Structures are given as C-alpha cells and as structure tokens.
Amino acid sequence: MTAFTYFKDEWTPVIDDYLAKHLASEVEDQKISQIMAYSVMAGGKRLRPLLFLATLNALGRKIEEPEIRIACGIELIHTYSLIHDDLPAMDNDDYRRGKLTSHKKWGEAEAILAGDALLPMGIQWIAEGSKSAKLVDLITKAVGPNGMVGGQYLDIDSTNNASVAGDAKFINKMEWLKTGCLIQASVEMAAVYAGASDIEQVKLV
C-alpha cells in the first residue's frame, strides 16, 4: 500500500466522526441537520480533506482539532456542490453513490436549502479553524464564478451549444473548474496554513 493509503485509512474515520458529531451538534433544527448529514455522510472518498491533512503532514504540521475543522469545512463545501449539481435544473440525477440524491429523498426545496446551508457552514469552519483571511480567500475563489460554479455553468451551457461538443480544450477547462479548482485549493490552503515557502507552494500545486 502507498503512504497515502495508510494516511487515508488512519484519517478518514476521524473526518467522518467529526462531520457526524458536529453536524448534529451545531445545527439547531434537527430536520435540516438530518437532510444535510444525509449527503455529507453518504460514503464519499473524503479526497479533498485528506489532501489538506496529508499536505500538512508532509510539511511537518501537527494535525489537531483546528486542522480537522478546516478539512471538514472543505468537505461540507464539496458536498454542497454535489447536492446542487444533482438538482433537476442542473444534472437531474436520481442517484449518487447508490443512494437517492438529496432532492429525490427529501424534496427539491429541502435539497436546495441543505446545499445553501453547507456552503456558508463550510466557510465558517475554515475561518474558525484557521483564523486566516487568506484561506477564506482561497476557498471562496475556488468555488466561485472563476472556479467550481463557473465550471458548472460551462457544463450547463454546453448542453445547448453544439459548437463545443467534443472540444477537448473546452472540456478540459470545464472539468478543471468543476473539479480541479477545489482539489488544488485543498493543497494550496494547507501550504499557506503550514507556512510553506513560495518555492514549496509552487512545487505542491
């Protein structure tokens, strides 16, 4: 097994436990907490929070509660994007990871609100854990109109635009914005948080 596999096996349960406990304890309304947790705890790979923590580990930074909170904040934001991507107005998916999507399980309005709640809560966790405006800046840029949301717009626009069908450059840009930006941000945030040098940051991202 690779070093990352060992790291993943050690830290995935920690991430899962933190997400489950804090979604239950920090969301006052039990129903919206349940709807949020349905998607967050649906068995994702936790790639983004693991990359954040693994980068910290590689840079010699000790992983404690604040670092786990930041990592889990990234996962909340990722889950928000999945809930909204699955909506009828977007990709219109009925299943994700072998389970009904949020809007199929709870209703479209409820799914929208769950996503709407996860996004700011994720940013809140990152801000609270890091005490860093720079990390908040990095995550909001990664998920905004020049990042993840921009990629989803290109995806939607491409369905009505025959001129980009099969265009490798367009597809690569769309996939980078939809997926790559948040993955890169997870590593970059860890590098900034750990105080990596400019040269180290360039090598990492």
Where are the regions a protein language model picked out?
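Mg2+-dependent prenyl diphosphate-binding active-site environment of isoprenoid biosynthetic enzymes
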Residues: 11, 23-205
